[in-house]
Amino acid sequence: MVRKKIALIGSGMIGGTLAHIIGLKELGDVVLFDISEGMPQGKALDIAESSPIDGFDVHLKGANAYEAIEGADVVIVTAGVARKPGMSRDDLLGINLKVMEQVGAGIKKYAPSAFVICITNPLDAMVWALQKFSGLPVHKVVGMAGILDSARFRYFLSEEFKVSVKDVTAFVLGGHGDSMVPLVRYSTVGGISLPDLVKMGWTTQERIDQIIQRTRDGGAEVISLLKTGSAYYAPAASAVSMAEAYLKGTKRVVPVAAYLSGEYGVNDTYVGVPVVLGSGGVERVIEIDLDKEERDAFDYSVNAVKKLCEACIALVPSLK
């Protein structure tokens, strides 16, 4: 059987971690691409040399030319500048938009049939621009955000309730930024909703509100502690879970930055919503009922994303 090919555009901390996790899971052969000569080759070799110890059979190689991604089944994009302490994701828009233009052209030429996962910030605007630049079908281009934000929310809740993260479910909608919308009503511990757990005395609404804010600040918290970089383990794990759902056709119900064409009353915008993710890419966008408070927060988040997309158009008018 021919193994799947997974191309990683960007070989920084997330790219290297992606390659390692993909190797351990034996999801496919890996091409690490980066414009920095030697970096992708060195990381590919280092990970490959760990394979006899960890017992995985995956071919890894590094490259500095887009030709190397030719025919890739999955492309995961991390290329661009990462946040530093004190920066918001939105501060990266100008420089990373130029990167997306180059990456989109490379994907369009060499991997037009791939399923593309974008991680580059500001996420929702960058995946929107990447889809435009690449010309790939909207259901084959997604952004990694909701899974990561939901994972952070789930972890913080598991710590609050002192239970296994496996028994905590959570949904975070909207843009991947300060306006993200953690949905308390749809978040559960062992099937019991958070509002019911508050009524049962397991926690207080004040604590839930604090956890929601910590979730919104999750990336910034990691950055402030690291001081010299941004999160990479959790973002990489999130993206690999998306790639795995596509490659194995598992039809996972997960929150991703997906293209909306009327769903939730939103058009021509990528924003975090629950979807069915399978071998067809985004096979279905799930529209859940939102109460007025949730709807207002979601609309506010969508408008924040739209403003970023408008800023992209101001820089590159052809995106319109």
From Swiss-Prot:
- Which organism is the protein's source? Bartonella tribocorum (strain CIP 105476 / IBS 506)
Q: Where does substrate bind?
A: 83, 89, 121, 152
Domain of life the protein comes from: Bacteria
User: Is this entry keyworded Oxidoreductase?
Assistant: yes
Entry EC number(s): 1.1.1.37
The keyword Cytoplasm is assigned to this record: no
Enzyme class per UniProt: oxidoreductase
Tell me what this protein is called: Malate dehydrogenase
The UniProt function text for this chain reads: Catalyzes the reversible oxidation of malate to oxaloacetate.
Q: List the active site.
A: 176
From the UniProt record, report the name of the gene that encodes this protein: mdh
